[in-house]
UniProtKB/Swiss-Prot annotation:
Signal peptide per UniProt: none
Family designation: Belongs to the PDCD5 family.
Native source organism of the sequence: Methanosphaera stadtmanae (strain ATCC 43021 / DSM 3091 / JCM 11832 / MCB-3)
Sorted UniProt keywords: DNA-binding
Name the UniProt record assigns to this protein: DNA-binding protein Msp_0595
A GO molecular function held by the record: DNA binding
PANTHER family recorded: PROGRAMMED CELL DEATH PROTEIN 5
Length: 118
């Protein structure tokens, strides 16, 4: 019986160590996820503040409306606007009309297909 008890005790210790190692690993990955989330939030806040300085309220509203249907396009345009403003290639503040022109230029690269029936 003592041999059996000794085997059980060793196995219990081994399981506890494995569980402790797994918990430590989860804690590290949780910390990493929290840091990544915090960095993402900080980036979003910086982007939001930059756009607040670059765009007029009407232009910001247009981007917000467009984001509902084409979020990836809006993100790309926002980054483009920030880069252009930093390079001083953009007259600040960007009005709604200027934003419309930028949107037309970036989306006009698509092909137009015309079908004629005879």
């Amino acid at each position: 019986m003592s041999d059996l008890d000794e085997i059980r005790r060793r196995r219990m210790e081994q399981l506890k160590q494995q569980q402790l190692a797994a918990q430590q690993q989860q804690g590290a990955s949780l910390e990493q996820m929290q840091q990544e989330e915090q960095a993402r939030q900080q980036f979003e806040n910086q982007k939001k503040n930059a756009l607040r300085q670059i765009l007029t309220p009407e232009a910001r509203q247009r981007l917000a409306n467009l984001r509902l249907t084409k979020a990836e396009l809006v993100n790309a345009i926002e980054m483009q606007l920030i880069q252009m403003a930093q390079a001083k290639r953009l007259q600040i503040p960007v009005t709604d009309a200027t934003l419309k022109q930028i949107l037309r230029e970036t989306t006009s690269n698509k092909r137009e297909i015309h079908i004629t029936r005879k």
